[in-house]
Amino acid sequence: MLKWTSNTFKDILELKDGPVTYSDSGRGNLKMSNHPYPYSIKEEEFNFLRNLIVEHNLQRGYECATAFGISSTALGLGFKETGGKIVTMDAYIEESKGNPGHYRDMQREVYDKADGYKSVKYLIEQFGLENTLFPEIGWSPDDTETCIRRHFSEPLDFVFIDAGHFPEQMIKDIDAFLPLLGEKYVLAFHDVYPQSFSEAVHTTCLKRLARKLRLNFHIHLVKI
């Protein structure tokens, strides 16, 4: 069984006996060798997310979206250390369509034969996360609460959003998890570009969280 080290990201790249193999995108991300998309988070982000969970002793998390389980594994390793649990959900449309923006105008659709789902299940086995990381196939916002409640009923204290990089989807994702949050929590958003984390998203956060977010780098945190 693999364990977390400072080289875990590279260890994943070298795995060759699973349902998929992994390759470097050339930009510091990993990808499944037989698919153009999706891309994973980068190594420094992987370690950052794992350490974030441990440093704050977080217990119940939700990730949207899984992709093929690299960020999920980072989070799972953190929650394994704290004794917590995390649900990760994806519809796997980016993989099935080979296009990260294809589902912008789609209605609810899920792809239940995804290599990404097979990949995250494989990584769970490799890192001994069977009691920590729970992958679900679902569409945000429609299936968010149902998928989370299959695994725990207590409030969330962590959410990581790395799904549709366009304002209307980010607002839907935020509205889906807000009712499930506890009093204190940490939120993390990936790829917070101006065109995706727009003024409309800022306004939504201001109304729902009573604060406007200040963004920097690629992962933005909200700690409450």
Regions picked out by a protein language model, each given a short descriptive name:
Residues H35, F46-I224:
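S-adenosylmethionine/decaboxylated-SAM
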Residues I12, G18, S25, T132, ...:
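Short linear motifs in intrinsically disordered/low-complexity regions
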Residues M1, K16-S23, R208, L213:
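Short, flexible helical or helix-coil boundary motifs
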Residues T8-D11, G26, C205:
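Terminal low-complexity, poorly structured segments
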Residues M1-E14:
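N-terminal auxiliary segments of SAM/dcSAM-dependent transferases
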Residues L13-H56:
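Class I SAM-dependent methyltransferase Rossmann-like catalytic core
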Residues K3, K16, K31-S33, F152, ...:
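Generic detection of intrinsically disordered/low-complexity segments and helix-coil linkers/edges
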